[in-house]
Regions:
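Phosphate- and other anionic-substrate recognition elements at nucleic-acid/protein interfaces
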Residues: 1-152
Length: 152
């Protein structure tokens, strides 16, 4: 009886985005089977750009450069949440739209995830704090030092 060689599992690269109008977090994760590996993470600082239109331009440029550099198979984006400040929600929606446009410009599929679903998946608690999410991700990806900004 001959043995059939097992096909190696395909690696999938995912660009995760946490859009914001002052700070935008991102991470590049390679997934093989059910095992994720952190490739890169960071934040895009937008506070130094006073004009909202310029912030949107920078979001587009940076997300596009991440897509072109890492060539992700997929983009995971935090879906909008509902807040009381309409102006803030409008600005956040624009930031999310621009990030989506940059990925779609290179034909990378996008999936939006509700913040509570992300927290539930990472920590087991949909109401977890950013600190709790960061702590769990540090354990999963063996990150020694907690990032200064928890949007990363």
């Amino acid at each position: 009886m001959s043995k059939v060689a097992k096909k190696p599992e395909k690696e999938t690269l995912v660009l995760g985005l946490d859009p914001g109008t002052n700070v935008m977090g991102y991470a590049i994760i390679a997934v093989r089977g059910s095992r994720p590996t952190l490739i890169q993470y960071g934040v895009i600082h937008l506070g130094k750009y006073g004009d909202h239109a310029l912030k949107l331009k920078k979001i587009f440029e940076r997300v596009l450069s991440l897509v072109e550099e890492y060539k992700p198979d997929h983009v995971a984006l935090e879906a909008p949440f509902y807040g009381k400040n309409v102006q803030s929600m409008l600005k956040l929606g624009r930031a999310q739209g621009v990030a989506m446009s940059a990925a779609l410009y290179r034909e990378v599929p996008i999936t939006e995830y509700a913040p509570k679903k992300v927290k539930q998946s990472v920590t087991g608690n949909g109401n977890a704090s950013k600190e709790q999410v960061a702590k769990m991700l540090m354990q999963v990806f063996n990150i020694k030092e907690q990032p200064k900004l928890l949007d990363a």
